[in-house]
Amino acid sequence: MIKIPRGTQDILPEDSKKWRYIENQLDELMTFYNYKEIRTPIFESTDLFARGVGDSTDVVQKEMYTFKDKGDRSITLRPEGTAAVVRSYIEHKMQGNPNQPIKLYYNGPMFRYERKQKGRYRQFNQFGVEAIGAENPSVDAEVLAMVMHIYQSFGLKHLKLVINSVGDMASRKEYNEALVKHFEPVIHEFCSDCQSRLHTNPMRILDCKVDRDKEAIKTAPRITDFLNEESKAYYEQVKAYLDDLGIPYIEDPNLVRGLDYYTHTAFELMMDNPNYDGAITTLCGGGRYNGLLELLDGPSETGIGFALSIERLLLALEEEGIELDIEENLDLFIVTMGDQADRYAVKLLNHLRHNGIKADKDYLQRKIKGQMKQADRLGAKFTIVIGDQELENNKIDVKNMTTGESETIELDALVEYFKK
């Protein structure tokens, strides 16, 4: 038997309705913030991610699904969404649009060759937003407010917003030099990844999952001590907006995101639920990127965005015992007796469905008792029984499956009955 590839999942009907509910709610929330949907290809040129995500990142070095197409071009299944959206922004010359900033959102599958663990898959669904074309602290604050709004709209309460500033390029350069000087004497004690990053991207050492508890990390210089006046002022304005909005946050000077393109504001949303031993799970992350467009041969525009995993959102809802308010039950199940009634039911179903009524019938020639059980399993709100007598008299009993009460109406009036 051929089985599903490792690190992937089948989303079966019982779960797909949850996905559809979440995606529909996210679509609606985006209209409140004036964000428009963008759809980019599932695969892109490998060079896009090598340049846009960063050669020194784990994503590029270890996790990408890359192959040669029949034209001998290097192609990669997208591991994240920002680089592709920025590529589209540049390619379609959106910088010429007077409605700056351009507010975009995306939703779709991403691919990373990761070790399978709870909430992580090699094909995962990512929802994200990008606001491109305005370097303004109020845009950063709006994006952070949106993050909180999204998770709170699903009823999640144990949320912890963690923020930091990674400064502008000048601040980062000075900070990186200080990190190299700090870690160089002890780098031999660190993992091979950290050793390779020392002179390429030393900030990523702070993000190492293997060596996070080493004393050298705890005593490492802090980026906040290397921010120039412009970066400090920008960060203070972002925090002031968050204070005005009443959004609580925690500052973590060691917070650096795993991708190379972040500048200024960086953030993560954590789930901190004491009901499961205080475990903290990263639900969402993002930040500002002020050099990414130029890195991809675009204009000197700036942007900010975030991405979240639908799988992790579902896991968080499960952890907090939150049931989604999903209404997908049938309006009506038709029970038939005899061939003539069954033929009529096919025609009636077509009429009902074209009038916006969710309806179904038996297809296995079950007895009446079996058909009623099927109606109950499907969660039908109402049932009707059609036989020769009902067809002859043009009258049916509509049974409410919740109360057990029935009402006799004319068969021709069934649509009107459900629309009243």
UniProtKB/Swiss-Prot annotation:
It is found in: Cytoplasm. Its main location: cytoplasm. Signal peptide: none annotated. Pfam families: HGTP_anticodon (PF03129), tRNA-synt_His (PF13393). GO terms for biological process: histidyl-tRNA aminoacylation. Its EC number is 6.1.1.21. GO terms for cellular component: cytoplasm. Keywords: Aminoacyl-tRNA synthetase, ATP-binding, Cytoplasm, Disulfide bond, Ligase, Nucleotide-binding, Protein biosynthesis. It catalyses: tRNA(His) + L-histidine + ATP = L-histidyl-tRNA(His) + AMP + diphosphate + H(+). GO terms for molecular function: ATP binding; catalytic activity, acting on a protein; histidine-tRNA ligase activity; transferase activity. InterPro entries: aa-tRNA-synth_II, aa-tRNA-synth_II/BPL/LPL, Anticodon-bd, Anticodon-bd_dom_sf, His-tRNA-ligase, HisRS-like_core, HisRS/HisZ. Disulfide bonds join 191-194. It is an enzyme of class 6 (ligase). Homodimer. Belongs to the class-II aminoacyl-tRNA synthetase family. HAMAP family: His_tRNA_synth. NCBIfam families: hisS. This is Histidine--tRNA ligase.
